[in-house]
Curated annotation (Swiss-Prot):
InterPro entries: Aminotransferase_I/II_large, HisP_aminotrans, HistidinolP_aminotransfase, PyrdxlP-dep_Trfase, PyrdxlP-dep_Trfase_major, PyrdxlP-dep_Trfase_small
Gene name for this UniProt entry: hisC
Modified residues (N6-(pyridoxal phosphate)lysine): 229
One GO term (biological process): L-histidine biosynthetic process
EC number(s) per entry: 2.6.1.9
Protein name: Histidinol-phosphate aminotransferase
Amino acid sequence: MTNKILSQVKPSLQRLIPYEPGKPIEDLAREYGFSPSQIIKLASNENPLGPSPRALDALGRNLHKIHLYPDGYGYYLKEALSHHLDIDAENIVLGNGSNEIIELLFHVFATNEEDEVLFSKYAFAVYKLMAELFGVPFKEIADVSFNHDLKAMLEAIGPKTKLIFIANPNNPTGTRVSNEDLYLFLERVPDEVIVAIDEAYIDFVPDPPQTLSFVKKRDNIVILRTFSKMYGLAGLRIGYGVASKYVARYLERARQPFNTNSLAQIAATASLEDTQHRLLTLKITEEGKKRLEENFDRLGLPFIPSSANFILVHVGDGDFIFRALLKKGIIVRSMKSYGLAEWVRITIGTEDQLSRLLEELPLALLSFKNNRPQ
């Protein structure tokens, strides 16, 4: 890029380090000569069962309509969510993944260096990325045992604070705050500060906080949810926010027309009806979590007890273990980009996927031990 063009690029964008997603199966297949069917991906917390059969059936019945623009309002999905959540459709804002709702919050509430955003040290990387993209100052609040320090977050609120992000359960640590502590925090946050509670993994929590009740009584609470995890629709990019009707109207104004495609809306609507798929997903998640924890204990690997569908585990050198497993056709997630260089995050897969992981992981650990500088 010439200096003349570079001078026109926003300074905040020049400094931005792009988000690094989990390695795609297709990339690994090209690099190592694997067939895609030989590869297991345990990096991005996707549902190993895939989408609901009802979603696949609905997609098949509607493929012939893709020459038409989608419903820009998302009427049927909003109505389904309204029934599912027991909240008015006017409280719901659809997004191209819940990431888009995060971006919309910045468009509406925090757009320049006069504002400020708060989030935890080991929080979802997109909060920081969006703050940097918009040129908004931010404070990373130190964690307590890999969890949110809500007391410190309250104390950090200042006159410039516009947005607070709390992922619960948190990604990438898998930790959650107690319902009581969260309720107390929400009651104490000033009315003019928006609190975005990112509940991407809330479907895996047996006793979830009743955060929607706060949306019904306060304008400054926004709930973020996704169909990418429990519902297995990550590739269709569909999520939503739940906010007061007043806030929802402004989020709607900020979004692009037709921001959620027709197939995503159709699949998400059908997925909400499939209780059996959700129960089966929960079953393999809990069984797989127990199995991984038992094996990590046996291998002497410290891990963070998780309330989500993944586990953060200490392996000594996350990049080394990540690369060693890649050579065996297994994709996990190195946590170096999160400042957790000695850790990897592992999605809880199917029984067969975990068997293969647990066969190769000890060999990767042994290789690290033998190659570690003395």
